């Protein structure tokens, strides 16, 4: 059981290291934060008044993260 946990821990560290080296953490975190801030503003605005219109806020947030964040 200990060997299995060690293997998963090592794999997790490797994946984290690869992710960290491929994208600067500060930029990625700031980008995600900016997208989420826009999402919250969209939900609080008058354009979010029913399920379908509020869903557009989610769509815009997803697009922001997928296309704008490295």
Swiss-Prot record:
Tissue expression remark: Expressed by acrorhagi.
Signal peptide residues on this chain, from the entry's feature table: 1-20
Compartments in which it is found: Secreted; Nematocyst
Cystine connections: 31-69, 35-64, 42-57, 48-54
Any GO molecular function: toxin activity
Cellular component per GO, a single term: extracellular region
Domain of life of the organism encoding this protein: Eukaryota
Alphabetic keyword roster: Disulfide bond, Metal-binding, Nematocyst, Secreted, Signal, Toxin
Predominant localisation class: secreted
Other facts: This toxin interacts with divalent metal ions (zinc and nickel). This suggests it may function as a metal ion chelator to regulate metal ion levels or as a metal ion transporter, or that its function is modulated by metal ions.
Similarity field: Belongs to the Acrorhagin I family.
Protein role: Toxin that is lethal to crab. It interacts with divalent metal ions (zinc and nickel) suggesting it may function as a metal ion chelator to regulate metal ion levels or as a metal ion transporter, or that its function is modulated by metal ions. Is not active against any of the voltage-gated potassium and sodium channels tested. In addition, it does not show activity in bacterial and fungal growth inhibitory assays as well as in hemolytic assays.
Entry text on domains: Has the structural arrangement of two alpha-helices stabilized by disulfide bonds (CSalpha/alpha 4(S-S)).
Protein name: U-actitoxin-Aeq5a
Organism from which the protein derives: Actinia equina
